[in-house]
Amino acid sequence: MPRNLRFLSVVNHVTKQVPTTCMRCAVGCGHVHLGSENAYGLETVRGDPSHPVNNGLACGRGIRESADPAGEWLTRPLVREDGELVQTSWSDAMARVGATIRTAVATDPDEVAVLGSGQQTNEAAYALGKLARAGIGTRNYDANTTLCMASAVTAYYRAFGSDAPPPTYDDIPNAETHLVWGANPAVAHPVMFRWIRQSATDGRLVVVDPVETKTAAVADDHVSVAPGGDLALARAILRHLVDTDQIDESFVRSNTEGFDDVVSALPSVTDAAARAGVSLDTVEELAALLDAPTLIYWGMGVNQSVRGTATAGALVNLCLASGNLGPGTGPFSLTGQANSMGTRVCSSKGTWSGHRPFEHPDHRRAVAEAWDVPVSRLPDDSGPGPVGILDSSPSVVWTVATNPLAGFPDATAAREVLRDSFLVVQDAFRSDTVELADVVLPAATWGESEGTAMNMERTVSRIRAATETPPGVRQDLDIIADVAARVAPGLLPRPPVSPSAIFDEFAALTEGTDADCSGISYTRLDGERAVRWPAPEPNSDAGYRYYDPSTSRWTFPTPSGKARFSTLDGEPLPEPVDGDYPLTLTTGREADGYNTGVRSRSDTPEEPVARVNPETVDTYHDAVADTDGELRTTVVSRRASVSVTLDRDDAVPPGLVWLSIHHPMTNQLTSPAVDPQSNEPNFKQCAVRFVHPDAPAKADFLAAEVSD
């Protein structure tokens, strides 16, 4: 019996086949769920042949994690008594949460931090953002989507005036070149990668990544760029296009601005290629790819850097300069979590609902009127991002479907802040963060929930319950509404809340915006399965290419109506290697892992496995213990030390240490430095060294800190 059948029962349950949306990644595949007849949970999961996104295709991991997640379920509210978490009633738990938030708000609304997630439904995300901004009034509101997507979002806004990817899945079959940069869709987006490989059969698939990933292993070519060298490589390619007269001059002059400023700041091809760690021939070959209709995909390898916005902008620059913005072309950011897009559109920390500019007075008034609160109640800036939020040491932290104790960079520092705060954790699974909580609120997961989600190509789909919510567990939306009733009465309906009513409220607030969802309703989604925004009318949706074929004109939602080239030059890497820390640590996904691993691992392994090149092992053999062929060392950064098992792997270049993002200890090592434009952390690069596991690792670490 699947482990997510939480309680055996003989009561009646939903047993019909229920169409819904996969909760694993942002491809947004339609699923069909069948609830169990004799228990709470899902009996079977399969792809939905009627869903327009995937037409029945589904990856094994999405099916497996929907039907049988490996995490430990939360089943009752918990509160901390005498240092221990003990079961309590919902009324007691909610009374504690409400009273504590009210007390903090009376002192300063910014004493309350609210952290949401790309795992929420649109409705829960919208309600949480409304409560945080208009009820609590805090600027310290964000979601874990900023940890992975903020740099791409910021680059899109800077280029197009909107966080709306120009390409859609419809473009994949029409592209002749698929340039995958700092992403691993073979692991992270298997269904989408199947489409990419099918299209590349008659074209080219090229991967830019320091590591030979699963995607790179089946590509036509793999460019092993130096860690942190992505921006330099993109600039080298653009410089080559300029030097060889391969710019689409007509498109650039008519539809863009800022090109001359970019060109004047470009380094020479030779200098940029050297910084990227590639040959001049490689630059020439990559530039030649752009002659054909090209989709440039990128992911966390680009975004999670102090240079993330600059690098994503440089990739957009390549599309603009080469005219790759029509069918079968364009800059395509690959979103990770299932509802990252929805979290941004519904309640983004950087904009109001519907991409309304946060600091624009007209939009602030419109939001205040829609929410029936004074404009003065709304915070006057969008906040410092997740890392900055914890740096401010709020007295109350409320997390919803996220695990900051394992997911934040410099996790030890995050632990100290969370330990000193009144911590409220709302989740379906027992996460690392739960262990520090003062109150734990058990929430329903997707197979038990009603709502909607948005995938990476802006398509809205329904999430439907195929099983009842177990006793002791509540819907995210109802929990948020209960807190609102205690903190800001009247702001949200009292639970139980109608998800469709909340969606209608959200959709109405998007009317006239670039993310117009006002033509989408539950009734429409019940009939069509999925609708792509902008959809301003009940029978409309859009490809959103910023192009009107009836007039042959490009129009972008920028002040000038033109797309903008990025002139950002990027930040220096915060931790270049040196004599004390000669190795570079990077992080990445594994095929069977998900985020911090809460729902994809049943037991925490004793120590993570670090993939390293055999040459690296040989170079630092004095710091490696070999016990009957098992290699172990201690990885030490400027923040922490972690014992690891070494996996000799030729796919990882010499000098690089690769750790999985799914292990809860990984982010003890990573740097809290953030991109100054997006506030996204620099997860993909920090300096480390190896220390023999029998050495006093902690003392070694402290000594290093003193000497720095």
UniProtKB/Swiss-Prot annotation:
It catalyses: nitrite + 2 oxidized [2Fe-2S]-[ferredoxin] + H2O = nitrate + 2 reduced [2Fe-2S]-[ferredoxin] + 2 H(+). GO terms for cellular component: cytoplasm; membrane. Residues 586-613 are annotated as: Disordered. InterPro entries: Asp_de-COase-like_dom_sf (IPR009010), MoPterin_dinucl-bd_dom (IPR006657), Mopterin_OxRdtase (IPR006656), Mopterin_OxRdtase_4Fe-4S_dom (IPR006963), Nitr_red_NasA (IPR054894), Prok_molybdopt-oxidoreductase (IPR050123). Its EC number is 1.7.7.2. Residues 15-73 form the 4Fe-4S Mo/W bis-MGD-type domain. It is found in: Cytoplasm. Optimum temperature is 80 degrees Celsius at 2.2 and 3.1 M NaCl, and 60 degrees Celsius at 0.9 and 1.3 M NaCl. Pathway: Nitrogen metabolism; nitrate reduction (assimilation). Binds 1 molybdenum-bis(molybdopterin guanine dinucleotide) (Mo-bis-MGD) cofactor per subunit. Inhibited by cyanide and azide. Coiled coil: none annotated. Induction: Repressed by the presence of ammonium as nitrogen source. Optimum pH is 9. The keyword Cell membrane does not apply. The keyword Lipoprotein does not apply. [4Fe-4S] cluster binds at C22, C25, C29, C59. Keywords: 4Fe-4S, Cytoplasm, Iron, Iron-sulfur, Metal-binding, Molybdenum, Nitrate assimilation, Oxidoreductase. GO terms for molecular function: 4 iron, 4 sulfur cluster binding; ferredoxin-nitrate reductase activity; metal ion binding; molybdopterin cofactor binding. Its cofactor is [4Fe-4S] cluster; Mo-bis(molybdopterin guanine dinucleotide). Is probably a monomer. Initially characterized as a dimer of proteins with a MW of 105 and 50 kDa. Enzyme stability and activity depend upon the salt concentration. Belongs to the prokaryotic molybdopterin-containing oxidoreductase family. NasA/NapA/NarB subfamily. This is Assimilatory nitrate reductase. The gene is nasA.
